Amino acid sequence: MFALCDVNSFYASCETVFRPDLCGRPVVVLSNNDGCVIACSAEAKQLGIAPGEPYFKQKERFRRSGVVCFSSNYELYADMSNRVMTTLEEMVPRVEIYSIDEAFCDLTGVRNCRDLTDFGREIRATVLKRTHLTVGVGIAQTKTLAKLANHAAKKWQRQTGGGVDLSNIDRQRRLLALIPVEDVWGVGRRISKKLNALGIKTALDLSEQSTWIIRKHFNVVLERTVRELCGEPCLELEEFAPAKQEIVCSRSFGERVTDYEEMRQAVYSYAARAAEKLRGEHQYCRFISTFVKTSPFALNEPYYGNSAAVTLLTPTQDSRDIINAAVKCLDKIWRDGHRYQKAGVMLGDFFSQGVAQLNLFDDNAPRAGSAKLMEVLDHLNAKDGKGTLYFAGQGMSQQWAMKREMLSPRYTTRYSDLLRVK
């Protein structure tokens, strides 16, 4: 038995948690460089605002409608997500973190001692009490059915109270008949068009199809979906995310970059951040790549995009090694006279910690005290906020940095941003 817990309007809700004065007001969160809408509160959705709308086109409309806009505050969202997931892990045997705002919970054995509907309400109430975030809870025998139960819990929140137990077969069929096939987890628009052409309009229609025919005309993934809709678990709970095969750190610049020194600072920063992520995965890498590009949509400007890579003989997780390699790559591809829109650093060819081997022919031997130095660096930045300790090459002003002109405070991760109660 699975429960899918999904935070309602997560990004927007994180902003309103610390701003009770925004209760009942439309709130939107913008993408990198305040480009377009990526999240809306329920009040904003009622005004017809949808994700993907460019901010510069809607700015005047937002002002007239009293819409409150925020730049993306990823540090706040990550910490609030961690609080939600920690709460869930205390309440259920196992948890699979599916995304920043949703998780699958293992309810094996719970129904033997608890009513599942009551338990779903308890999960919802506990998360609300600890984080002031509202979650929808969908309970069913399979992940796909739990997704649909969660969809119903959020769509008909007033009738369901934010939680739906879909373990009853008759209730399953009634709900499946109401759900368009394109809303089924894993179906998507392209496949739904083919299904509609075959007369398969709803989730119930799909569940009644022969698995053999579905596999023959589509694929094994859709066959699993059909089996899951019929209550046959095909997707197991994954407590541990598979090891990453690569790490990419890149951003579009707040302003076009034309100066080499500014680009070098950006590559320094991206490489340092990528190295930090690498250590967080307890991995070493040998492959480091840097890319730069101009905007393909800029009028009367030639497009230029290029990348270069370095393969180290000895795997490393030291920020200094990764930064040096990334800057060498930049030197190979930098061309004067362009207005660069974006750059990034990619790491690959990973080795697990303790498995990486030295190379006799490598001139760059591992640095003495490297592991301890990186540990101190990560500890201070985790404790006092990202960027507390940084490399001089990253620069101080960082005029190229991503625009976040409406950034809210990092209420939960920076002492300087703690709320003051009067």
Question: What is each model feature region?
Answer:
Residues 1-227, 236, 365-422:
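Gly/Gly-Pro- and Ser/Thr-rich, intrinsically disordered tail segments characteristic of DNA damage-repair
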Residues 98-102, 140-143, 283-287, 338-342:
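Short Gly/Ser/Thr- and Asp/Glu-enriched loop/turn motifs at secondary-structure junctions
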Residues 103-109, 307-313, 356-362:
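Short, hydrophobic beta-strand segments
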